[in-house]
Amino acid sequence: MSLFRGSGVALVTPFTEEKDVNYEELGRLIEFQIENGTDAIIICGTTGEPVTMSEEERLSVISYTVEKTAGRVPVIAGSGGNCTENVVSFSKKAQLFGADGLLVVTPYYNKATQNGLYEHYKVVAMAVDIPIVLYNVPSRTGVNFLPDTAARMGNDI
């Protein structure tokens, strides 16, 4: 697994008035970022509103982004959630759809212990063959993935 370098931009997901993904605008956003030197595109992260989309829509956005970037920059796809099994399932699909890496938010609401967070991320990391970015945003999730836990994970995986 290679590490990502430089600056990655977390894109919004543009929608039409009818609440469908606006692929024309998404394409413009992707091209703008690449033309202006971003080193990676992050899709379906918090600002991409994945919780408002179906799994089919999320996978379609990932697939479109992979196709549009055409290998010019890596695509990092948001695949996080509360249920480890669901995160693993979606992460595998995102990898099949061509994502170069995964953005996996710390499970929210349930307030897992540090060991629970470690196990969650370990199971996800072991299930895919692409790098994962641990997305620790305690102000949104209500739980903080502590540095000691991250160091343990870095040593073990």
Q: Could you tell me what each predicted segment is?
A:
Residues 2-9, 14-144, 150:
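Active-site beta->alpha loop and helix N-cap motifs at the rims of alpha/beta catalytic domains
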